[in-house]
Amino acid sequence: MIRHIYKIMIAIVCCLLAIPTEAQTKAEKNGWRLGMQSYSFHLFPLTEALDKTQELGLKYIEIYPGHKLGGKWGDKVFDFNLDAQTQKEIKELAASKGIKIVGTGVYVAEKSSDWEKMFKFAKAMDLEFITCEPALSDWDLVEKLSKQYNIKISVHNHPQPSEYWKPENLLKAISGRSHLLGSCSDVGHWRREGLNQIDCLKQLKGRIISLHFKDIAPKKAGENEQHDVIWGTGILDVKGMLSSLHGSAGAITALQNSVAHYYQRASSADYLGV
């Protein structure tokens, strides 16, 4: 029962390695790794989020900036202000559960000088990518640091007024720049902005580093936002999106914003066999 409860909160990170569960075996056929976005468990401290990730048999996690650590670290949060000893201990804790911290996000720099701090932190934590939304004026600096530290920049597409709400804007910003720079494709936000998510994925082919992969409910009268639902129960073409991603070495993350609402649902991960 616990397995089904937490699988529906899953954030799927798909890259190159396999993970030994039925759904993960399906994903392996596509060359994907499966993992967790820690915001799926934002009601719990990171120590518990790691426990739940381990219970699912997942080996990878992306941690959102500000996630409270819990345990002996109490109210300390996951960000570039963590001292070196705590960074080491968090890596060791994750490793002890067979989990690698592959990324952090969504990060938005308060000032340009913070980018160096974030890249140093990401390097110390052995992260593969930073999910973020850089200011347009910061791109030269971000590209330079990305090359210097060999860490990918995965740009998220929050809705307007975000600069990157549609693929054309991101592609313009990174045109002619390093392929260490690319997209964290949030398919739900595209649909909320009236965009066709499959067309968006096609536009970004070759530039997708990670995805926040989800399905969303139809918009109801009086609602400000279409909430996330289990894959295949909403209005997005989940099978079509997964089919369009065959052969991609990007990362897929299904981001759910509550726990209790989905206790009775089947796992979204079953769709990875598409």
What are the roles of these predicted feature ranges?
Residues 33, 69-74, 98-100, 123:
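Acidic/histidine-rich, surface-exposed loop or edge segments in extracytoplasmic proteins
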Residues 1-27:
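Bacterial Sec-dependent N-terminal signal peptides
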Residues 23-38, 42-60, 96, 112, ...:
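Histidine-acidic metal/acid-base catalytic patches
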Residues 87, 93-182, 191-194, 203:
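Active-site acidic/histidine proton-transfer and metal-coordination neighborhood
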Residues 63-89:
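Glycine-rich, proline-tolerant flexible connector loops at the mouths of alpha/beta enzymes
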Residues 61-64, 101-105, 131-132, 253-256:
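Short beta-strand segments at enzyme active-site cores
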Residues 38-40, 76-81, 105, 128-129, ...:
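The substrate-binding groove and active-site-proximal loops of carbohydrate-active enzymes
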Residues 40, 65-67, 107-110, 136-138, ...:
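Active-site-proximal loop/turn and secondary-structure-junction residues that shape catalytic pockets
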